[in-house]
Amino acid sequence: MGANNGKQYGSEGKGSSSVSSDVSSSTDHTPTKAQRNVATSEDSDLSMRTLSTPSPALICPPTLPGFQNGRGSSTSSSSITGETVAMVHSPPPTRLTHPLIRLASRPQKEQASIDRLPDHSMVQIFSFLPTNQLCRCARVCRRWYNLAWDPRLWRTIRLTGETINVDRALKVLTRRLCQDTPNVCLMLETVIVSGCRRLTDRGLYTIAQCCPELRRLEVSGCYNISNEAVFDVVSLCPNLEHLDVSGCSKVTCISLTREASIKLSPLHGKQISIRYLDMTDCFVLEDEGLHTIAAHCTQLTHLYLRRCVRLTDEGLRYLVIYCTSIKELSVSDCRFVSDFGLREIAKLESRLRYLSIAHCGRITDVGIRYVAKYCSKLRYLNARGCEGITDHGVEYLAKNCTKLKSLDIGKCPLVSDTGLESLALNCFNLKRLSLKSCESITGQGLQIVAANCFDLQMLNVQDCEVSVEALRFVKRHCKRCVIEHTNPAFF
């Protein structure tokens, strides 16, 4: 994606080049002038063209002899009627210093259907386009150029692609968007550059400097960014609420910069306004880093720490001390989290609605009892692969968390039909149930669930020894249920 502000982007010039060379590998997004130099090749560097909005070029039919006006624009504005055409004739065999030029009128072309739409409809259509496509639309004609840069379309920037020079694209874009408000881009609220591996600290620093109203930033999979860049963003964007740094392996902490902490900005105080934080696969994150994050991000409500393999129960203790408003928490695949960690999580009490502890092998019925006792409003629990959980833990969970809607206890070999019976008799609102690879489950347990949980929408019994009759029973009683199974006789 890209945008330009009317000048060439050479070295560190004040203007900006075609962003399309960075975003969509295309040419300048502003309608270009007809080339005056007849010796200029069509293969010249397209990314260095001027970005000013010209009047529609005079187009010569390619069949006319002596046509040497370079590349004529084939995308002249359809709103122009009775267009004048410059017809250049070859000079006669005499010594004439100038070619003879005569003007002729081209027959009026029928207006394209899309050009009949009013501006507000065009802006609405453009609002559904990704950023790089929007930049390409800006190249069609003058009207589209003006519409494509409507401020309402630039509340979000979304860049994708591993080969994009994201740092440069962000610099050019923010510069173009700052034309009406020098040095700041007040309309931009969301930046999504997930999977752009060429993003570095320089690109994030550009965002931090130019986007004070930023509310959402997603840089998942951008593994070249570091703590310092994240510090800049959270320090200079006081309204930031949503931050996704999943897969950013160099990020080990989130805090204010030293300068921001010293100045005690009235916008910040000492706190960061982030409510949603995803640090999945930040495998270098340790307890001390989580301590710092919790101390600065006290307003967190959604926190995802999947596969942060160095975290322990101590880190969860810090988290609960500072972040008392957490509603959703995932510590799945954190192998050092045990029942003691769940005891700390249980202190969130009825505020906790979503908990994922999948593949935390040290968790047993003891930890489940802590959560079930104090987190009575729990709606979602993923305990897949917690092999220490038995029917006793499931029974205690079912009796205390009666509003449970989604439960995953797959690969828990000690859970049997007894646990399913407790679920069926207490959790009538259950909609999703995964029992994948639960070796002790039989068709009898499934029938009890189906007879009581009529709203069941998804049932996973892959690699379970259940009969076709039991699966058909489930289908009859739970009409909307999608059954995932490995029984070839059932279809």
Curated annotation (Swiss-Prot):
Q: Which SMART domains match?
A: FBOX, LRR_CC
Q: Compositional bias of type Low complexity: which residue ranges?
A: 16-26
Gene Ontology biological process terms in this record: cell division; G2/M transition of mitotic cell cycle; mitotic cell cycle; protein polyubiquitination; protein ubiquitination; SCF-dependent proteasomal ubiquitin-dependent protein catabolic process
Residue ranges annotated for the F-box domain, each copy included? 111-157
Q: Which domain of life is it from?
A: Eukaryota
**InterPro entries according to UniProt:** F-box-like_dom_sf, F-box_dom, Leu-rich_rpt, Leu-rich_rpt_Cys-con_subtyp, LRR_dom_sf
Which residue windows does the record flag with biased composition (Polar residues)?
A: 27-55
What is the organism of origin for this protein?
Answer: Mus musculus (Mouse)
Location in the cell reads: Cytoplasm, Cytoskeleton, Microtubule organizing center, Centrosome
- What this protein is called in its record is F-box/LRR-repeat protein 7
Keyword set for this entry?
Cell cycle, Cell division, Cytoplasm, Cytoskeleton, Leucine-rich repeat, Mitosis, Repeat, Ubl conjugation pathway
The function of this protein is: Substrate recognition component of a SCF (SKP1-CUL1-F-box protein) E3 ubiquitin-protein ligase complex. During mitosis, it mediates the ubiquitination and subsequent proteasomal degradation of AURKA, causing mitotic arrest. It also regulates mitochondrial function by mediating the ubiquitination and proteasomal degradation of the apoptosis inhibitor BIRC5.
**Stretches for region Disordered:** 1-79
Annotated Gene Ontology cellular components are: centrosome; cytoplasm; SCF ubiquitin ligase complex
Quaternary data? Part of the SCF (SKP1-CUL1-F-box) E3 ubiquitin-protein ligase complex SCF(FBXL7) composed of CUL1, SKP1, RBX1 and FBXL7. Interacts with AURKA; interaction takes place during mitosis but not in interphase. Interacts with BIRC5; this interaction allows BIRC5 to be polyubiquitinated by the SCF(FBXL7) E3 ubiquitin-protein ligase complex.
Q: Which family does it belong to?
A: Belongs to the FBXL7 family.
